[in-house]
Amino acid sequence: MKKGFTLTQTGILLTLWLTFLLSFVMRLSWSSLMPIVNEALHFTAQQGTSYLTAFYFGYALTVLPGGLLADRFGYRKSILGSLVAMAIVTGLMSTVQSYEYGLVLRFLLGIVSGPVQSACLKAIGEHFSAEQRGTAVGIFMSCTSFGVTVVNGYAPFVAVHYGWQMAFLITALLPLLVFFLALFTVKEVQAFRKGQTEETQGTGQQSMSLAQSLRFVGTNRNILLLAVMGFFATGTTWGVTTWANLYLVKQLHVTPIFAGAIMSIYGIAAVIAKPTIGFISDRISLPRNYLAAIVMFLFSPALLIFANTSNPDMLYITAPLLGMGAFMYSPLTNAIIIQAAPPELRGTTAGFVNLFNQIGALTAPIILSTVLTATGNYQTALMALSISPIIGAILLSLIRLK
């Protein structure tokens, strides 16, 4: 099959990319603004970190139900509903005056963001053939790291010059713009069904009950390995990403704007790396899980180098290296999710794996905060996570794909 994208495919991929991008801009807005808001509202570092944890609690509650809903009622409804809800909750963050109120809002933001990734991956599975998915998912997943670049590119600047409330209000407007685009471009189309025939063989049926769906994803060896891998790898990625601004400001004593600029470079490196590795994976014979294991293993030394950077000028080198290490594996692992799942269970499978991803992302800030409390050192806290990508790489090497 021709590997180039049609105009329709390009349109749907752009919309999915923007939707997932904004889900990360909403998520990361707090990480970018945390040093400023903590000071303005007199929050402790642990209170600020608990806002990250609250988001992941809410997110983890809805990733699996979101996948089930996308399989049964369609990804279009999931995407449109999430965009509107994310805009409302993020706008309300501008009204936070108490710790408890903000904590509830962050929890709600996690709940309404949870269904997005599963719905988008299901849409990619329908609209792109097996030979196109590495590139498509690579482009799609670039939005997560680009979200780091986007939010750090404007949020600290707006907060410093116009107030942190205005930064949240501007952030809240963005999903509404994409909502109107999605109304016209996101369609439920069962594409490339003939080319997917070999992927459906062995499932035994076209439609599964809720119990059968959960039983399948909970007992499939490849899916379970992907899930546990995600706990270690994704947890480390987002633990590092959400804590990096605080580390730079508190440990290296740089300004919030400088930290935002460094994290923008971090994100740009990941943006370039993701579609590049996806493009490569579509054109080499090495199985995707082995390629993913290699790039995930490299995440560990990249994190150690970043955590041991003492000269702020060296961050221009070590931050992009970390950005590539932290994100390059994700297009490959998400393409493997689509490949490992029957077409009718792609949303459920993505939600199941993402549930473990978010448990990891929920656990990582707790580990970081605990180590920080015990040692008083942000550097040691980051280094404590460096073993996790190695464990993830080992698990990826055990996957067996047809």
Each model region followed by its residue ranges:
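Cytoplasmic helix-loop-helix junction between adjacent transmembrane helices
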Residues: 105-146
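Helix-loop-helix hairpin linking two adjacent transmembrane segments in secondary transporters
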Residues: 140-191
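Extracytoplasmic
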Residues: 11-45, 240-245, 364
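Extracytoplasmic gate region of multi-pass secondary transporters
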Residues: 30-31, 221-267, 274
